[in-house]
Amino acid sequence: WAPRPLRAKSTLRALALSGDEAYARALCVMAPDARSAIFSKAMTRELGGYRAEQPLIDLMRNAPARNGLDRAQYADLKFWLPGDILTKVDRTSMAVSLEAREPLLDHRLVEFAAGLPHNRRVSGMEGKFAMKRAMEGTLPGEILYRAKQGFVLPIAQWFRGELKDAARAAARSETLLDTGWFDADALSRMAEDHISGRRDRARELWQLLMLDRSMSLLGNTA
């Protein structure tokens, strides 16, 4: 397997060039400069230069690793897997009374894979290289080497269609603006840029909508 952003060819090239910074940036929903643009001046002062991706960068810089791929995979094991994908699998399976098991999480298999040379884990732009080779003869080629099919939702279209009012409402939410964290004009521009088709801000708007819903339900504890 390769870390999440390495599934994009451009990010693999970026990792080869600039390591931890490139990988951390690829994981972010918003680039640092885009985040800064929507924060209020007071919030920017309070952050004092802190970046949300700093824990990931620190993990990579301190990883017991031989190269950039090792550092990225180490950070995935410590940060992205437990904090994102495994949590989602656990919660969604338990919500429907299923007990999920991830066989590839066996610690002996993980240790074996971590010890493989980088060119046995990623070959050119192809991830999961060793696993695919190992399964040849067991799985047919059209299954083993078919293009990945992700679980992508059409949120960009939603926010330009049936959810455009929800996007505007989130950008103008009193719950969010009362925190003092955001620049109101910047949030409105972000929503209108997306709705008009000038830019794709779907992921940022989704995060904003989820934050608004969460704070409305749970209250502002900031």
Regions inferred by a protein language model and the residue ranges of each:
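Adenosyl-5′-phosphate
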Residues: A8-A222
